[in-house]
């Protein structure tokens, strides 16, 4: 065996230099000596290096020689062994040659069989490949047949999925170029056919959904109307509860709320054709084209829906028009909520803005044409239902409500004009007779319902009301006006519209009712009973104005206690009070005119009679009878303050008439007998005034202003003319006590006309009467002093 290689030893011979040792070490370690050689040549001193290399070579040769001497026996053994190996190799070679020959003989036959087998394998492979190709073709053709079947059955989604499978999984594998080419050419054609077919079905759906939009809109608006009715009923119950509980929660706000789920469950319409068409176009890779197609066609439909015909009155077509628009946008809302990203919100917003501007323009135009408040209200109600319905779907309906608000004044003008005609009819056809109520139901309808009762106790029937039938008739008209106004103002821009309603209520009471009453009052043909009944009616209408305000507050959902404060009353109440005073004045004018007809002092009195009168004139009885009739009637229907005004006015007019007659130019002179006769007449009137003042109960109310006190001027004048010392008039103390109402100039004028009978034909006989002479002197003195005073 070979021994292990001994470690390398470096022998240092005598004479070796340090450089030789370094070089020897580098070579022994197998290091690269190239840099050392290069350095030596670069320095121009290669000889020392060559010398060193030779020394190293000699050392190596010496080492080899020593190695051979040490292992020569081992070398010999190795050579012998190598010779034995060569002999064995020759024998092995001979055996291999023999075996190879025999193998060649046997393998020739097997090789022929192998070639046949390989040929069979090749045939099998070709057949297998052919079968595989055939299967691919058959499968592709079967898919084509299935695709055709789907198309014929209208199952376009499955047809497209089948074509997609053919394209992705089979088309590249089809070995037959002809078949592959045919399929490649037919696929686009089939896709185009499917797209056209789907578009055709979608167009049919567009026509159908447009024709269905009216029913959809009507159903949705009907649901909103039902919800509004339920809401109003709930508010009414809430209002009654609040009225009964004065410690309630105050004013509450309510909003109409209709659940979308309820509407969605009722509003059933099929969007499947739309979904299918969009899905198929998405599979075809052209979803954007279909979205544009849908948007353009729906926009055209909307523009067509927004066209109204002028051959049919708008009041007959507005529901169809508005329901069609409502249905259109309900469909669009369902599409945008259920079809994913098919429809953009901006597109729907554009369509809505188009619709809203057109609707507003149509409404403003049609409202301007309307001349019936009923028609305008019908349209307004339906428009607010439309707004409430579409607001639930997120549409901004403010502009539509603004259009309604702009027509508010137009509606109320029409309503006022309609109510004016009704009020004129009610007042014109009034009999001005106290209303006779025979049944409790009539009492409730005509009195209690308007708070016109004068007592909280139910009267006995038959009941004679202090007002005529005009009052409840007018109250019903005003109540219907309030209802009509509330109906228009409800569900509009302003939820708190009571202040607006209050303004319109004042308007009808002042500009319509009050004007008609004043026109009636100014009519010269009215009689005393008419004027008196009108005054009484105004008093009750003034009282009813509080009911009107409470009723308006009730309809607005405002607690009645908030309008029961004095400062909350209507301005019309003050105006009606003024008109009531005008009615009293008209009544007094009629009474005074009639009194003038009865009295006619210049005709009924002999101002220069020579006979001493024994009693009052006959005309004074007619005056008293007339006054009795007037006061009795007034006491039945007029309030106490009005009764007092009528009595005072009539009595004062009689007093003024007496004084005016003495001042009249038609009376040139009068004597003491005439004064005595007038004195008798005046006493009758004074007695009547006292009796009526006390019997009517006015003495308990007006303690310091009796009827007699309004005859004081006439009484003081008669007393002065009857006085034995008339010159005392010029005495300030006496005048202040007895004649304080008489005017100097009037007294002077009247006294100038006073001619005692002593100045007559038989005056010489009268001179014998000392009293008459003294009175005459006193009168002459008064005349003189009055002239001086004047």
Swiss-Prot record:
Disruption phenotype: Male gametophytic lethal due to defect in pollen germination and pollen tube growth. It holds the Pfam family Sec15_C. InterPro entries: EXOC6/Sec15, EXOC6/Sec15_C, EXOC6/Sec15_C_dom1, EXOC6_Sec15_N, EXOC6PINT-1/Sec15/Tip20_C_dom2. Keywords: Coiled coil, Cytoplasm, Exocytosis, Transport. GO terms for biological process: acceptance of pollen; intracellular protein transport; pollen germination; pollen tube growth; vesicle tethering involved in exocytosis. GO terms for cellular component: cytosol; exocyst. It is found in: Cytoplasm, Cytosol. Residues 49-70 form a coiled coil. Its main location: cytoplasm. The keyword Transcription regulation does not apply. It comes from the Eukaryota. The exocyst complex is composed of SEC3, SEC5, SEC6, SEC8, SEC10, EXO70A1 and EXO84B. Component of the exocyst complex involved in the docking of exocytic vesicles with fusion sites on the plasma membrane during regulated or polarized secretion. Involved in polarized cell growth and organ morphogenesis. During cytokinesis, involved in cell plate initiation, cell plate maturation and formation of new primary cell wall. Belongs to the SEC15 family. PANTHER family: EXOCYST COMPLEX COMPONENT 6, SEC15. This is Exocyst complex component SEC15A.
């Amino acid at each position: 065996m070979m021994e292990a290689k001994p470690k390398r030893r470096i022998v240092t011979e005598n004479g070796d230099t340090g450089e030789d040792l370094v070089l020897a070490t580098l070579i022994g370690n197998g290091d690269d000596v190239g840099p050392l050689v290069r350095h030596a040549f670069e320095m121009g001193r290669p000889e020392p290096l060559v010398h060193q290399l030779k020394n190293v070579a000699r050392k190596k040769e010496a080492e080899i020689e020593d190695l051979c001497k040490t292992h020569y026996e081992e070398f010999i053994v190795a050579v012998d062994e190598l010779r034995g190996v060569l002999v064995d190799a020759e024998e092995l070679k001979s055996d291999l040659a023999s075996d190879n020959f025999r193998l060649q003989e046997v393998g020739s036959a097997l090789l022929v069989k192998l070639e046949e087998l390989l040929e069979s394998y090749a045939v099998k492979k070709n057949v297998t490949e052919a079968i595989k190709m055939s299967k691919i073709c058959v499968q592709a053709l079967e898919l084509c047949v299935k695709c055709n079947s789907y198309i014929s059955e209208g199952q376009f989604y499955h047809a497209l999925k089948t074509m997609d499978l053919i394209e992705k999984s089979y088309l590249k594998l089809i070995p037959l170029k002809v078949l592959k080419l045919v399929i490649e050419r037919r696929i686009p054609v089939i896709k185009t056919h499917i797209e056209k077919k789907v578009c055709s079905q979608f167009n049919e759906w567009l026509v159908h959904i447009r024709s269905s939009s009216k029913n959809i809109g009507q159903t949705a608006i009907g649901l909103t109307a039902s919800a509004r009715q339920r809401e109003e009923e709930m508010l009414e119950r809430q209002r009654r509860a609040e009225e009964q509980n004065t410690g309630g929660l105050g004013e509450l706000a309510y909003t109409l709320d209709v659940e979308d789920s309820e509407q969605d469950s009722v509003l059933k319409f099929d969007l499947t054709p739309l979904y299918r068409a969009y899905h198929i176009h998405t599979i075809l890779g052209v979803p954007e084209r279909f979205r544009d197609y849908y948007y353009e066609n729906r926009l055209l439909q909307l523009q067509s829906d927004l066209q109204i015909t002028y051959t049919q009155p708008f009041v007959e077509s507005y529901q169809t028009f508005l329901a069609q628009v409502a249905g259109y946008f309900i469909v669009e809302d369902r599409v945008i909520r259920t079809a994913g990203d098919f429809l953009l919100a901006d597109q729907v917003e554009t369509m809505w803005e188009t619709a809203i501007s057109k609707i507003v323009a149509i409404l403003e135009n049609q409202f301007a044409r309307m001349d019936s408040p009923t028609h305008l209200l019908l349209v307004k109600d339906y428009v607010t239902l439309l707004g409430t319905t579409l607001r639930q779907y997120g549409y901004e309906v403010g502009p539509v409500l603004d259009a309604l608000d702009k027509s508010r004044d137009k509606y109320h003008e029409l309503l006022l004009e309609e109510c004016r005609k009704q009020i004129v009819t009610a007042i014109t056809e009034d009999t001005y007779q106290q209303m006779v109520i025979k049944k409790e139901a009539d009492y409730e309808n005509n009195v209690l319902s308007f708070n016109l009762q004068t007592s909280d106790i139910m009267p006995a029937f038959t009941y004679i009301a202090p007002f005529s039938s005009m009052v409840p008739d007018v109250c019903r008209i005003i109540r219907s006006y309030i209802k009509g106004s509330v109906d228009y103002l409800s569900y509009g821009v302003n939820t708190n519209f009571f202040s607006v309603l209050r303004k319109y209520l004042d308007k009808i009471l002042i500009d319509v009712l009050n004007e008609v009453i004043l026109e009636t009052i100014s009519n010269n043909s009215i009689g005393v009973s008419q004027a008196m009944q009108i005054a009484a009616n105004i008093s009750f209408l003034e009282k009813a104005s509080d009911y009107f305000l409470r009723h308006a507050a009730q309809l607005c959902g405002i607690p009645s206690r908030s309008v029961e404060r004095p400062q909350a009353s209507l301005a019309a109440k003050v105006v009606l009070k003024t008109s009531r005073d005008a009615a009293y004045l008209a009544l007094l004018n009629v009474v005074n005119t009639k009194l003038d007809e009865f009295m006619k002092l210049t005709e009924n009195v002999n101002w220069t009679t020579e006979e001493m009168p024994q009693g009052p004139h006959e005309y004074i009885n007619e005056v008293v009878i007339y006054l009795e009739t007037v006061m009795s009637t007034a006491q039945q229907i007029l309030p106490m303050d009005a009764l007092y005004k009528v009595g005072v006015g009539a009595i004062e007019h009689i007093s003024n008439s007496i004084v005016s007659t003495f001042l009249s130019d038609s009376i040139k002179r009068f004597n003491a007998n005439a004064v005595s006769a007038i004195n008798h007449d005046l006493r009758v009137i004074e007695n009547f005034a006292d009796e009526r003042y006390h019997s009517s109960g006015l003495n308990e109310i007006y303690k310091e202003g009796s009827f007699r006190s309004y005859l004081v001027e006439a009484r003081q004048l008669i007393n002065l003319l009857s006085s034995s010392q008339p010159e005392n008039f010029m005495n300030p103390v006496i005048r202040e006590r007895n004649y304080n109402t008489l005017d100097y100039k009037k007294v002077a004028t009247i006294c100038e006309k006073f001619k005692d009978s002593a100045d007559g034909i038989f005056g010489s006989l009268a001179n014998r009467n000392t009293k008459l002479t003294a009175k005459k002197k006193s009168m002459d003195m008064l005349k003189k002093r009055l002239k001086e005073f004047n």
